[in-house]
């Protein structure tokens, strides 16, 4: 693995009433990093830029030696966003496959099933039958199932019971 997992240089993002940055940050390999700030400070925006969900207006992101714009790089990460939305008629397995597909990750049904069992979830259960905490566990199972090099969590423990 590289000396750093992620390096952000001069990252800015402009919204109507808010400007993020410039942000310079390096995440050393093997580290655990938390972003702490007030509501609306731009933490989720920064994570979405890191993962290639949003684009910065300026600056560069080096993610695992590549660009978050590249599918091969995105396939190396596991992501849980607090605001992820899926239709309630989807089953847990359909949601997880969709999440893996969004990031280009290889689908590992055996690993996903093991995480579902560990978290007490049912792959065939419809999303509309899951509580918010159960949905977060589902997102976490999907993010972990392909053994990512980097795990990005956006408030992934808010409303989550212990596992």
Give the label of every model feature segment.
Residues 8-11, 18-28, 59:
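Conserved beta-strand
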Residues 33, 44-53:
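Short, conserved post-Walker A segment of ABC-type ATPase nucleotide-binding domains
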Residues 36-38:
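The feature captures the beta-strand-to-loop junction immediately N-terminal to the Walker
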Residues 51, 59-73:
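Conserved ABC transporter NBD signature motif
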Residues 83-138:
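ABC-family P-loop ATPase nucleotide-binding domains
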Residues 147:
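Conserved catalytic motifs of ABC-family nucleotide-binding domains
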Residues 151-155, 160:
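Catalytic Walker B motif of ABC-type/P-loop ATPase nucleotide-binding domains
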